[in-house]
Amino acid sequence: RHQFLEHTFSPTQGYGASYVRISIGCNDFSSKEYTLCDKPGLKHFALQNDEISYVLPILREVLDINPQLKIIAAPWTCPRWMKVKDLQTLQPYESWTDGHLNPAFRKTYAQYFVRFIEAMHDKGFNIYAVSPQNEPLNRGNCASLYMSWEEEASFVAELAPAIKHANLQTRIYVYDHNYNYDNIASQNGYPVQVIDSLNKLKFAGSELV
């Protein structure tokens, strides 16, 4: 493992990659679906076994190899108690897959991000940037949350002040998705005063920005 990490991240002995992306809670490769606060109420927030036993030790190893490492983090889903089936009925939605963030929990979910950034800082890791949602237009992932452009903008309107109020320097990247999902050639129209970048994933499509 160390040899692979050194070949990947060492600026002198390897490729010198200095940017990694991690999940806030579970992702496609997790052994089970979970968030960092599965019980209602942020008093239950805590890093889980996957973070403590696997993610953090590897991040520490990478940081020892390349101290210039930047970490971006994104959730695959919000806690299920924050989900609704749709924005018309606001019916609670208990599935890990699909659903929407309940507008009533935007402020709470923003604090969820703050708690994560602070928890990682307490473990010795600076979160350089967050994105509000992994693949926000993908309804079918094992753990997912549908977040339209309008929903993401409304959430960022809560997230940006929450990060600033907590005296954190973490950036916000938006549209954490494939290049070919919108085919928009520029960032014009995005709220650039609080958003640092489009964070398009290189899974599909041609780069337009």
Where are these predicted regions, by residue range?
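N-terminal catalytic cores of secreted or lumenal carbohydrate-active enzymes
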Residues: 1-127, 147-153, 157
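Active-site neighborhood of glycoside hydrolase catalytic domains
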Residues: 107-129, 136-209
